[in-house]
Amino acid sequence: MSFGGESGLRNVGLGGIHPLTQRYAFGGKMSEFPIYKGKPTAYLDQNVLDIFVKYGMSEFAVNLRDSFQVIYSDETLKEIKRSGDQADKFLDVLNNLNAFHLKHVLTRNFEPTDNVTITKRDAFEAYQEYCEQEPIYQQLQESLVQSNFKSFGGRKGDSFDQIAQEQNEVFSELMSTIREQARLLEKSHPELARVMDSYAEVAQVKMEVALKESTSLMKQNVKNELDWSGVKEFRSFVNIGPKELNNISAPNVLEKIWEQFKDKEPYCGLDWTLEDFFLIKKSLIYPDKPYFKYQKVTAIYNHLNFIGFHPDSKTYKERRFVAAMSDLGHASIASFAHALFSRDESFIIKTRAAYEYLGITTQVFLVNLENA
């Protein structure tokens, strides 16, 4: 394997810990952080960490540690938490790999950027911090994907209005938490407190508008919303699914997929492009904001699953849907690394397809375990 220069790492800095909320690094301008110039970085899918938990620091693990700067994300910590009493073993593995913690950088107005930081820290400390702050964020994340879960056939018996109400209530709770934190900072950091309070107010309004519009649109287009599966309905309507799509191979995977759909109803009657189809022309929630590549990876990966390109199985079941969302999260954040390693071939194929179209230079490797 060959990795030259700083390719793929132009937006990675060495970060510290923000005193208010340690889930994200703050700054926005990468000039505020020293630029990382160390070894090529490697992001490991959870199934690779599983190998090292089961078999210890094998020769492969040592080679990864010595050849790369291994990095992990909050998505990694989320999966570790789901492992229950195995958590300490995963954290030991991260420490043995000398892994750094990767975080997104937000602006001082709490808006996303195309930058990340990686921080050297003890994995147990990072995990404890994650678990302390995770409940409300986890509740929000789980709530926001419920519409998506319903489109994959989950939430049987629940209406779009019911799901939207749940989402709005959870988001309101988070905004209330931010306002409470702002009040605590009024004397010591008045400008930051003002920004936080303003952000919470604006974000709440935008979320309510987005939920109202999306719910109205769904109700217009779905006849039996209580027993609806968007995946089944869509694939049946266009008469395209895994059987047709899984024959497509690189290069130009997304272009080849769009060729299959563009002359089908309803697309033949629309002035749509590939980017419309894969929902990457602009952000659906914040259409006036920059739409970064790592965010587009999320949209592409999810849509590939939806239309049936090497899809995850049984995503109408909550456990399988949660696993698919974690895969999507790993694919997105790993786009900041030089290399991504995974044992899941379907994950590899979808991730490579997204990276190829977006011009992301991260090299994606399939790990095969002999005698497994």
Protein language model regions, located:
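Active-site-proximal, substrate-binding regions of enzyme catalytic domains
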Residues: 13-336, 346-372
